[in-house]
Amino acid sequence: MMSIKNWTRVGLAGAVMAAAIIAVPALAQSDRGVEARLAALEKRVALEEDRAQIENLTRAYGYYIDKKVWSEVVPLFSKDAVVEISGRGVYKGAKGVDTLFSKVIGRQHKGLADGELSNHMVLQGVTNVAPDGKTATGRWRAFIQIGMWQKMGLWAEGTYDIRYVKEDGKWKFSLMRWYGTYFTPYDKGWAQASFGNNGPSKEFPPDAPQSVQYDAYPGHYVPPYPYPNPVTGRPWTQADTDRYSTRGMDPSNAANSSSAGSPLSLESQHPQQPPR
């Protein structure tokens, strides 16, 4: 006959086995939960790494533009990129990007001339990477100082609206638009004088006309925000842009400015002046 002590041992063993059987599904479920959390964390880390690469790309672009290093600017754009800078019209593809920067903006010159200043401070970036990690949006602003020693100086500022794409594992610009906010001579400042946007180049015409006509200062234009309000989630609409933008106040209208016209008009006085 089995003793009470032995019965107790058998009972404990059975209880342990039963507990183990019950615990197996729970442990499996727990493992799946951990794996899911790890996968979500890995995705968040990957998106933050993408964001860092995008921000470095955009800042590097600004530094290359400063010194007119066009050979380093062009590779930053995707093969099907679309670029539009300051009312010059739309340039498409690698050839168009090279034409706009090296021939239109750079006027077929590489690097800065002696005594030339060309600062483009790319600031205040707001970037959002798509959940799939393949595309992203960005909104930045450029504060610009242009000058030729003892000849002229120019202030300018404007908004970059940018789309990015991951091409062959590298983030690049797929769409870039820069909307000029103001252009003004250094000696007078924005309180007394303002110039309108540049027009299209006759020598190196764009692939398509300017996508949107808008007012520079003393008028104002609000490019559509590519992101929703970070608190309310409300998306920006074209109706919002229309509501907050002026019409007919561009400095190209002589009635709006004592220094009406394009900032390129300064080039006739100072041929070496670098256009923006």
Features from the language model and the residues they span:
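Hydrophobic/aromatic beta-strand elements that line small-molecule binding cavities or substrate pockets
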Residues: 123-127, 159-165
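Bacterial N-terminal signal peptides that target proteins for export
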Residues: 2-15
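Short, aromatic-enriched amphipathic alpha-helices that serve as compact interaction elements
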Residues: 50-66
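Beta-strand elements of well-folded, non-transmembrane domains
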Residues: 142-146, 164-166, 180
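Terminal "cap-and-tail" regions of soluble proteins that handle hydrophobic small molecules
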Residues: 29-52, 170-276
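Short, cysteine-centered beta-strand-loop-beta hairpins and adjacent loop/turn segments enriched
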Residues: 144-154, 182-183
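A solvent-exposed, acidic/Ser-Thr-rich amphipathic alpha-helical stretch
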Residues: 70-142
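C-terminal segment of classical bacterial N-terminal signal peptides
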Residues: 19-26
